[in-house]
Amino acid sequence: MAKKSLIAKAKREQKYSVRTYNRCSICGRPRAYYRKFGMCRICLRKLSSKGEIPGVIKSSW
């Protein structure tokens, strides 16, 4: 889990638009962020394996 202070800092409006960065909407993780889903890879994998994200299935070949 991310620090609460860093999550609050990311939500504030930045002075320069370049400084904004994406965080996971569930856990607040800043790295491995999937823009399409708005969450990190860990939360994406967890929710998709449960079947809570529509249209996402595990691939097998």
UniProtKB/Swiss-Prot annotation:
What's the record's note on cofactor binding? Binds 1 zinc ion per subunit.
Ubl conjugation: is it a keyword of this entry? no
Q: Which GO terms describe its biological process?
A: translation
Instruction: Name the InterPro entries for this protein.
Output: Ribosomal_uS14, Ribosomal_uS14_bact, Ribosomal_uS14_CS, Ribosomal_uS14_sf
Show the GO cellular component annotation of the record. cytoplasm; small ribosomal subunit
Q: Which Pfam families match?
A: Ribosomal_S14
Return one GO MF term.
zinc ion binding
The answer, when asked if Metal-binding is one of the entry's keywords, is: yes
Q: According to its UniProt record, which cofactors does this protein need?
A: Zn(2+)
Gene3D superfamilies in the record: 30s Ribosomal Protein S14, Chain N
Entry keyword set = Metal-binding, Ribonucleoprotein, Ribosomal protein, RNA-binding, rRNA-binding, Zinc
Q: Which family does this protein fall into? A: Belongs to the universal ribosomal protein uS14 family. Zinc-binding uS14 subfamily.
Subunit composition and interactions: Part of the 30S ribosomal subunit. Contacts proteins S3 and S10.
Protein name, per record: Small ribosomal subunit protein uS14
Q: Which organism is it from?
A: Syntrophus aciditrophicus (strain SB)
Per UniProt, what is the name of the gene that codes for the protein in this document? rpsZ
